[in-house]
Amino acid sequence: MLNIVIFGAPGSGKGTQSERIVEKYGINHISTGDVLRAEIKNGTELGKTAKGYIDQGQLIPDELMVDILASVFDSFKDSKGVIFDGFPRTIPQAEALKVMLKERGQDISVMLDLDVPEEELMTRLIKRGKESGRADDNEETIKKRLVVYNTQTSPLKEYYKGEGKYQHINGLGTMEGIFEDICKAVDTL
């Protein structure tokens, strides 16, 4: 199976590029953001708990996310692979994901890091918030999310470099140009 972690700060284009990867490679997309938004919309207990963290710009506790992902991953047993979008966000999550996949005879194939400067991220996220009405795309929450990303999530780059799975992708440019760079990285696996 082709198991990809797509990585980058909020607003780096993970969702957009994930859709293109899914279409080209015929793999399934697991977006923790979409899963969590569905839980919140449906008013589940997990959704209510998650909403409290999201509204404060904080990360969801690992044990909640790993359980959700294991269930979703297991529903794709006959798949060519999956792309993990929005997970892992910390080294303990990466280690938990590795264990969860190993228990299923799988591993991460590659981690794609969509690298975008912070000023551009702010511009993209403020625009997205205005267009979509997403509550977590206001300036104050965006700044908190970027601080969390830089302190808690960014160390994953070194983790995946150590695993030999890291691929840097320049997240500036056209969607097509960025996707070409992604395909070059994936096609060499």
UniProtKB/Swiss-Prot annotation:
UniProt pathway annotation: Purine metabolism; AMP biosynthesis via salvage pathway; AMP from ADP: step 1/1
InterPro entries, per database record: Adenylat/UMP-CMP_kin, Adenylat_kinase_CS, P-loop_NTPase
One Pfam family here: ADK
Example GO BP: AMP salvage
UniProt: AMP binding residues: T32, R37, Q58, L59, I60, G86, F87, P88, R89, Q93, R134, R145
Region span, NMP: 31-60
Cellular location(s): Cytoplasm
Binding site for ATP: G11, S12, G13, K14, G15, T16, R128, G173
Catalytic activity, as annotated: AMP + ATP = 2 ADP
SUPFAM superfamilies found in the cross-reference section: P-loop containing nucleoside triphosphate hydrolases
Cysteine disulfide partners in this protein: none
GO annotation, cellular component aspect: cytoplasm
Domain remarks: Consists of three domains, a large central CORE domain and two small peripheral domains, NMPbind and LID, which undergo movements during catalysis. The LID domain closes over the site of phosphoryl transfer upon ATP binding. Assembling and dissambling the active center during each catalytic cycle provides an effective means to prevent ATP hydrolysis.
Record-stated family: Belongs to the adenylate kinase family.
Protein's recorded name: Adenylate kinase
Originating organism: Bacteroides fragilis (strain ATCC 25285 / DSM 2151 / CCUG 4856 / JCM 11019 / LMG 10263 / NCTC 9343 / Onslow / VPI 2553 / EN-2)
